[in-house]
Swiss-Prot record:
The gene is leuS. A motif ('HIGH' region) lies at residues 42-52. Keywords: Aminoacyl-tRNA synthetase, ATP-binding, Cytoplasm, Ligase, Nucleotide-binding, Protein biosynthesis. PANTHER family: LEUCINE--TRNA LIGASE, MITOCHONDRIAL (PTHR43740:SF2), LEUCYL-TRNA SYNTHETASE (PTHR43740). This is Leucine--tRNA ligase.
Length: 863
């Protein structure tokens, strides 16, 4: 038995035990309830950061808790190991991405083990291995056969620095989410998966996600963006051509005064042949940022095409303008413009002197559009001679009437549209899974035959930083299909492909098929998924989409991939900088900072670095390389031990909120573990105890035991239902304060202490497993702690023998009394009136009323 708390020795010993016993390796067991706990797997960037530690500690706490509930718990881990950072590092270090990636995996794997996470390492996967991406390629060919994959030339977001296509979600404020380079527009052939075919189901099934955060569900609903409207056909004057427009406000159609089309619309390009101003405008729009944020902020500009459109209901001719706020790849690439009832159209019409005609007004007043558009759904008026019966109708009645009219004339139809676009999965980089499609000599594009899968990505390459090695190597692209020469696709998959199905591969990671359906359907869906909310509209949507694809191909039988989702907050740390001689900011690591002055609230006022630079303190911000304010988990574990780091991570804040890194609080967590260790070993040193006899306990012993069992109930509820791990820990700390002060003279004192400490180490086991493992054995228990059950509250101990009653006179506290739990009102009154404080404040007064709230409060009204 080790009497001193030495975390490095304790943790190494316990981790070796877990490894030798393969404690966390599991197989399917139909006789046990399963629990699949999964944290989003890491990109092997080189070192774990504190964000990883927080995510994986939360997952490990949940998994270990469920194990003590007697469940068959799967907690796997792997590596999201394709992606641009590996290419960039390879170019910088004059190596290939593969060795850099595998070295990082080895290092980070040791870090995860150092932190004591209970993973089933036998299921480890790395998405950059052919054993993994082979089945992704196979699945893609099946989707192609089902008509869910297609290739088309499309205007895409292009990062000129990384030379790759970005999804809309990967463009942040007009810049690449990875390297912050300004994004351009480029026409390029792309492979797409028809996620829009599943848009309705993806939206509808959000209602099944009862245990997902409302914020994530709202973000996905908005991203999918279902709308009901009418698609109507406009003619082109002096032409046989027509074009379609979709609107969710058909009630405003009688107020159309111009039509706006995308710069890339065929009509605009045709008109540009004889219009240099329009031609220049089209070129300008090609390189514009088309993200939502940029579109909302940019100046709305346009050029008249010289063409006119024919209104589908009135026959009126309205001008067609090319406008920078209309996108060719969104909707039909054309919008009807009603400046009286749309603010953007109003501003555009005012700028270019276009007509503004009001056709909707408030139900209780006249229309005023002198300053701005009226955008509410009022009642129709001014509908004109062609459709006068619209006047006086509200939105829905007008919608129905216009729909009926257009449908009967073959000029329009009611339609449901989605904001969601099909998923472009092509990337023009090397370090990704090759797309398994080939082009035959006659130009036909077909899937790679199954017997030629996987299409292996060569790993022994030279990165020149200019072109993908598989694009540069013309021999690699050559292949044979049925004796015919063919050429492989040299694009690779978006890495969101790999992360969309990894959770399912863990169920049968070594199967010679994509999934073993029996094993997949035993484990799936995931019971608890953990990751950042920043993934709400990318990974978490693709994750749900892929699960439905897997279901429809017969590999899984559930509709959704995860029952419960927890989105953990970021980890923040102090950030400091100084300006160098060139005026550039130099960020200084917190470990290199000396704080010289704080204010009365402890806020930093003055700090210097080790070289004497006076620093600017910018407050707490997300740990990042750019601000040099990351804290190395390895350093903290070496200094305090893994259990201390884990305890701090779980105690410092509720899991969904940001966590502020404070080393003083880490030291506090360390002191608590040392105190627990000392209390336990002081107890053990007193020798064996007699069995606990609850019938012989005195009042104080009963009160202590009641607190113990109330704590067991609260901690279980906090971890499982509320997921408020910080309050669970606080409850155990409060109990430990009482245990430290509890008497240990009698056999029953020590027997009660044995019961309490045996419960405490199990309550803390999910959070500080190394310490709990050791203390459990030191307390004389023969079984290892992983093989026992979560402590069960003794319901009889929770029954209170007495109640504490607050006694007030005229609403002010005058006494506290303890009465038997079954005391009547009369008994409570008698005892309350006998209290000195009550006598003092009622003497000489008339008692007007006595209010008794059973078991809680006695209020005496006297004057």
């Amino acid at each position: 038995m080790q009497e001193q708390y030495k975390p490095s020795e304790i943790e190494a010993k316990v981790q070796q035990h877990w490894q030798d016993k393969k404690t966390f390796e599991v197989t399917e067991d139909e006789n046990k309830e399963k629990f699949y706990c999964l944290s989003m797997f890491p990109y092997p960037s080189g070192r774990l950061h504190m964000g990883h530690v927080r995510n994986y500690t939360i997952g490990d706490v949940v998994a270990r808790y469920q194990r003590l509930q007697g469940k068959n718990v799967l907690q796997p881990i792997g590596w999201d190991s394709f992606g641009l950072p590996a290419e960039n590092a390879a170019i910088k270090n004059n190596t290939a991405p593969a060795p850099w990636t595998y070295e990082n995996i080895d290092y980070m794997k040791n870090q995860l083990k150092m932190l004591g996470f209970g993973y089933d390492w036998s299921r480890e996967i790395a998405t950059c291995t052919p054993e993994y991406y082979r089945w992704e390629q196979w699945f893609f060919t099946k989707l192609f056969e089902k008509g869910l994959v297609y290739k088309k030339t499309a205007s895409v977001n292009w990062c000129p620095n990384d030379e790759t296509v970005l999804a809309n979600e990967q463009v942040i404020d007009g810049c690449c989410w990875r390297c912050d380079t300004t994004v351009e527009q480029k026409e390029i052939p792309q492979w797409f998966i028809k996620i829009t075919e599943y848009a309705d189901e993806l939206l509808k099934d959000i209602d099944q996600l009862d245990e997902w955060p409302e914020q994530v569900k709202t973000m996905q609903r908005n991203w999918i963006g279902r709308s009901e409207g009418i698609e109507m056909t406009f003619g082109v004057v002096d032409s046989e051509e027509t074009f379609d427009i979709y609107t969710t406000r058909p009630d405003t159609v009688m107020g159309v005064t111009y039509v706006a089309i995308a710069a890339g619309h065929p009509l605009a390009e045709k008109a540009a042949a004889n219009n240099s101003e329009l031609s220049d405008f089209i070129e300008e729009c090609k390189n514009a940022d088309t993200t939502e944020a940029a579109m909302a902020a940019m100046e709305k500009k346009g050029v008249a095409t010289g063409l006119y459109a024919t209104h589908p209901l009135t026959g009126k001719q309205v001008p067609i303008w090319a406008a920078n706020f209309v996108l060719m790849n969104y909707g039909t690439g054309a919008v009807m413009s009603v400046p009286a009832h749309d603010q953007r159209d109003y501003e555009f019409a005012t700028k270019y002197g276009l007509a503004i005609e009001g056709v909707i007004k408030p139900s209780d007043s006249d229309l005023d559009i002198s300053e701005e558009a009226y955008t509410e759904k009022g009642v129709l008026f001014n509908s004109g001679d062609s459709f006068p019966e619209l006047d006086g109708l509200d939105f829905q009645d007008a919608f129905d009437a216009i729909d009926a009219k257009l449908s009967s004339e073959g000029k329009g139809k009611r339609q449901v549209n989605f904001r969601l676009r099909d998923w472009g999965v092509s990337r023009q980089r090397y370090w990704g899974a090759p797309i398994p499609m080939v082009t035959l000599a006659d130009g036909t594009v077909v899937p790679t035959p199954e017997d030629q899968l996987p299409v292996i990505l060569p790993e022994d390459v030279v990165m020149d930083g200019i072109q993908s090695p598989i694009k540069a190597d013309k021999e690699w692209a050559k292949t044979q299909i049925n004796g015919q020469e063919a050429f492989r696709e040299t694009d690779t998959f978006d890495t969101f492909m790999e992360s969309s199905w990894y959770y399912a591969r863990y169920c049968s990671p070594h199967a010679d098929e994509m999934l073993d359906p029996a094993k997949a359907n035993y484990w799936l869906p995931v019971d608890q998924y953990i990751g950042g909310i920043e993934h709400a509209c990318m990974h978490l949507l693709y994750f749900r989409f892929f699960h439905k694809l897997l279901r429809d191909i017969g590999l899984v039988n559930s509709d959704e991939p995860a029952k419960r989702l927890l989105t953990q907050g970021m980890v923040l740390a102090d950030a400091f900088y100084y300006n160098n001689e060139k005026g550039a900011r130099v960020w200084v690591a917190p470990s290199d900072v000396t704080v010289q002055e704080t204010d009365e609230k402890g806020r930093i006022q003055k700090a210097v670095d080790s070289e004497g630079h006076e620093l600017v303190y910018t407050g707490m911000s997300k740990m990042s390389k750019s601000k040099n304010n990351g804290i190395d988990p390895q350093v903290m574990v070496d200094k305090y031990g893994a259990d201390t780091v884990r305890l701090f991570m779980m105690f410092a804040a509720p899991p969904e909120l940001t966590l502020e890194w404070q080393e003083s609080s880490v030291e506090g967590a360390h002191r608590f573990i040392k105190r627990l260790w000392k209390v336990a070993h002081d107890h053990v040193a007193k020798g064996a105890t007699a069995p606990l006899d609850v019938k012989t306990l005195d009042t104080k012993q009963k009160e202590l035991r009641r607190e113990l069992h109330k704590t067991i109930v609260k901690v279980g509820d906090d971890i499982e239902r509320r997921q408020m791990f910080n309050t669970a820990i606080a409850s155990v700390m409060e109990l430990m304060n009482r245990l430290q002060k509890a008497p240990t003279e009698t056999q029953q004192d020590r027997a009660l202490m044995q019961e309490a400490l045996s419960a405490v180490v199990r309550l803390l086991y999910p959070i500080i497993p190394h310490t709990s493992f050791s203390l459990w054995n030191d307390l004389g228990n023969e079984e290892n702690i992983e093989d026992v059950r979560w402590p069960e509250a003794d319901q009889s101990a929770l029954v209170e023998d007495s109640k504490l009653i607050i006694v007030q006179v005229n609403g002010k506290l005058r006494a506290k009394i303890t009465v038997p739990a079954d005391a009547t009102k009369e008994v409570v009154e008698e005892q309350g009136f006998a209290e000195e404080g009550v006598i003092k404040h009622t003497e000489g007064k008339t008692v007007r009323k006595v209010i008794y709230v059973p078991g809680k409060l006695l209020n005496i009204v006297a004057n």
